[in-house]
């Protein structure tokens, strides 16, 4: 961090949990495909169980449809991971007087530029419960709050407070929400 520019990377969809889900869906889809083919061919293609004993219509056919659904879902998940949807950065440039929030989207990048003079405060939002939310956002004059933290897994409270305080100190604005 220099005295004039602060850049914060934002983690997108390249998280361990997304890799594990995509791998599980892929393996499950292959299992359903092999079970369906075993049922159709009358030979066991899977080392576990005896899918050749299944009647192709309707059981083997339905497993084939499950394998198609799993292949489509796995393709989507691997694409989201490859593109790193949601990843990007927050750049605060005092010299240029601008905040730049950039994220990677499905088809094109999302780029939002906000003049520093419009930033009124840094807001730390903590909501616990079933749908927990922990985020740092910019309070902007005449606009809705601009979230700065990643989507998904909530940040630890200590890190959230530290990030909010560091950003408020850098921008010279108040810290709200604690």
UniProtKB/Swiss-Prot annotation:
It is found in: Cellular thylakoid membrane. Keywords: Membrane, Photosynthesis, Thylakoid, Transmembrane, Transmembrane helix. One of its GO terms (cellular component) is photosystem I. Its main location: membrane. InterPro entries: PSI_Ycf4_assembly (IPR003359). One of its GO terms (biological process) is photosynthesis. It holds the Pfam family Ycf4. The chain crosses the membrane at residues 19-41, 61-83. It is a multi-pass membrane protein. Seems to be required for the assembly of the photosystem I complex. Belongs to the Ycf4 family. This is Photosystem I assembly protein Ycf4. It comes from Parasynechococcus marenigrum (strain WH8102).
């Amino acid at each position: 961090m220099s005295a004039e520019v602060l850049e914060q990377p934002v983690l997108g969809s390249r998280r361990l949990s997304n890799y594990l889900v995509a791998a599980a869906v892929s393996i499950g889809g292959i299992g359903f495909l092999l079970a369906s083919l075993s049922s159709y061919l009358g030979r066991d293609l899977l080392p576990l169980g005896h899918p050749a004993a299944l009647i192709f219509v309707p059981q083997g056919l339905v497993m084939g449809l499950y394998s198609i659904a799993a292949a489509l879902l796995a393709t989507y998940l691997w694409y989201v991971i490859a593109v790193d949807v949601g990843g990007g950065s927050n750049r605060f440039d005092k010299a240029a007087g601008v905040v730049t929030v950039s994220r990677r989207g499905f088809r094109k990048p999302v780029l939002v530029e906000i003049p520093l003079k419009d930033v009124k405060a840094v807001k730390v939002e903590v909501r616990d419960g079933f749908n927990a939310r922990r985020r740092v956002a910019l309070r902007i004059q005449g606009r809705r709050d601009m979230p700065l933290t990643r989507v998904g897994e909530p940040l630890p409270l200590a890190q959230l407070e530290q990030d909010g305080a560091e950003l408020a100190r850098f921008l010279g604005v108040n810290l709200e929400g604690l």
